[in-house]
Amino acid sequence: IVADGGQVVLYAPHIRDISSTHPAVEQIGYHCRDYFVKQWDRFKNFHWGDLAHCTHLRGAGTYDEVDGERDRVTVTLATGITEDRTRAINLDYLDPRHVDPTAWAADPDTLVVPDAGEDLYRLR
């Protein structure tokens, strides 16, 4: 549940790898669907499963050659993955040492989902 222009922070300081199932993510990065569709010649040789995975995290957005990629939400990792690697895959970075889930949970404008795992939803 994230408003347009909002932010999702994935807080998991124990995570050190981007994807063992989809190693191509480190070459491709996470983007909206239009980013791939409108640059198909650049991405046509990647496995479609990898491309699909790279759109699932980012979600809705648009892409054109003039304005570039414009995503509905910002996705930020607060993990054990380095800042350089996080930014290289087109995600924002937050040092997990600066995250206080208890303080965030006390903020009425912030939704904290403990142990969210793979249970991410978008309401219409």
Region spans (language model):
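Extended hydrophobic packing segments that form well-structured cores
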Residues: 67-124
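C-terminal catalytic subdomain
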Residues: 1-76
